[in-house]
Amino acid sequence: MTGSRAARASWRTLVAAGLASAIAAGCSTATPAPTPAAESLVMLASAEAYSSVLRLRLGFLEQGGQIEDLQVRLARAEEIQSAIGAGEFQLAFVVAEPDPHVWAAPIASVPIRLVANAANPLAEIDVEDLRSIFAGNLTDWQELGAPAHAVRVISQEPQFETARAFRRGMLGGGQIGGGAIVAPSGWAMAQAVGDDPGAIGYLMCNDLTPRIRPLRIAGEGQPLSREASARLFAIAPHPPTGVALEFLLWAQSPSGQQTMLTNCSP
């Protein structure tokens, strides 16, 4: 017992000495402030906006954005409106005029490119020929001086802003023929056109890949897409704060815009 009491007394002496040392150190040196925990952010993106937001995400992380986990989830437009309206997500991205009842901020105006398969030798196309192709009246590339190959028209969902802007700016409001294949997104369009030597389509310029290339209007010397663009918006249930605000400010910065508009130079 005596040994046990002596051991406990010795232990209490050591603890007291340790506390005294800690208090003394605390009096002479300020205790460092705790490092704030990195935030997480899950963002929604429509099919039109998805690849653009993925680019922004990657660029933000490469620039050293302070965030623990940054995710982009693909969602339908109606799902986005419902989730933002209910306050379930801090941030979402759409390519369309946003609902006036939600907080919104413009991110970028992205030029639309008319594109063909990289194997297509044509560099230019007359606007009337373009409209004939999309109306379904011109069906073989041989009619335009290219090697014989069936024209395969690929369009986007008619409710997409990219499709509307293309019809307004490039087709003069004309409709697209019923034989067109519908791609569900810009990256799907890029893949479809890249897979078919006879394909022609359109997409936002940051969806360009080495397997496709833009066509020009004959005589104008500028990509046809200079006449049409699609606008990317961020929407939120309320003005963003924290890492959501940090991400938006970076997206609107010159660095963010450069990341966003990769492949978009004339």
Specify the residue positions occupied by each region the protein language model found.
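Exported/periplasmic ABC-transporter solute-binding proteins
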Residues: 27-86, 92-266
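Bacterial N-terminal signal peptides
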Residues: 13-25
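Bacterial N-terminal signal peptides that target proteins for export
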Residues: 2-15
